[in-house]
Swiss-Prot record:
Native organism: Aspergillus terreus (strain NIH 2624 / FGSC A1156)
Protein name (record): FAD-dependent monooxygenase pytG
Cofactors: FAD
Main location: membrane
Pfam family, any one: FAD_binding_3
One GO CC annotation: membrane
Consequence of gene disruption: Abolishes the production of most pyranterreones, but accumulates high amounts of pyranterreone 5.
Keyword terms: FAD, Flavoprotein, Glycoprotein, Membrane, Monooxygenase, Oxidoreductase, Transmembrane, Transmembrane helix
Protein topology in the membrane: Single-pass membrane protein
Protein purpose: FAD-dependent monooxygenase; part of the gene cluster that mediates the biosynthesis of pyranterreones, a family of antioxidative compounds. The first step of pyranonigrins biosynthesis is performed by the hybrid PKS-NRPS synthetase pytA that condenses 4 malonyl-CoA units ato the acetyl starter unit by the modular PKS of pytA. The acyl chain is then connected to an L-serine through the amide bond by the modular NRPS of pytA. A tetramic acid is formed and released from the PKS-NRPS pytA to give pyranterreone 5 with the help of the thioesterase pytI.
Amino acid sequence: MSATTLPNVSVAIIGAGIGGLTLGAFLRRLGIPFVILERTAVLTPLGAGISLAPNCLAALEQLGLYETIRQNAQELRGINVYREKRCWGTIDFGLAKQWFGYNVLSIERYEFHRYLYEAAGGAGVVQLGWDVARIEGLENADGDLRVISADGREVHTDIVVGADGIRSVTRRILSRSMGLQPENTIRFTGRVHMSGYTKPLSHLSTTDLGIGHWMLYNDCILTTWPCKENRQWFIGVKAAPPDEKSPDRSVWKGATSDTVNAVYGSRFHPFGEDGTVEASMYAIPAPAIAGNSRDDKLSIIPNASSLATSSRKPTSRTWFGAEWRSWVMVYRT
């Protein structure tokens, strides 16, 4: 066996995101040999927060992760829905455990990712810098598959699982092998997103713990989700300029704290010390992210590829958390 060939495994998982790591963690518990091939050379924190529903937590308990996550997450007790300053009502999550066996929990995404990484076996099974170029042996009935990277490394396996996200290399390779032609059905909705994470909001009381907000302003949206220590994970949505037709641009591109506060800074928010978003969400300085992304269904997908390499200095003040990034929203026709 050459130095560029990994030992044979039963399953090769392409992608070390949440899906790939979760599958790896289950395979590890079952004693099934596997490897996870990740294109990124260095794993860095991505995303702001994530909410975990009861069906997800049931699976995580099977992996032995539930107690760790519960201790480091915040229970979601309710979401207050506002139209400008008027409260339309509250979505009560208090019965989730009674009905489904678990509460809904919110946790920092990178922390959740780290727990899954360790549960899957960490560096012992996750191969970084694996830019998959091709999969050979798809025509073989005996299941002998070879996953080959752009730099010539390869792994022999019985099963290949594509867990590599919306721009899936696995899907493209399989489509070509089946003679399918790609079709671009993506359309830009004209909505762009940003997300981030605040520092602990010390002025909030214990009654505020676990309460989220959907703020429906006339020309934009801001949703805030409770996390541990009264920190808030937030998502903002804003319309692009009327003449903006390209999903490759963003109204947040090159944004500074002034740009963001021009959209949300003076808006009403119940957690604001003076009733405004800027007061409720002020945090440590944050670098600006110039990239955006696109998806092939109605959802939001992050792109923080420029975060690690950005030379831009942090702005002096912003109501964001330690980092924030931008999205575009697209849909499939």
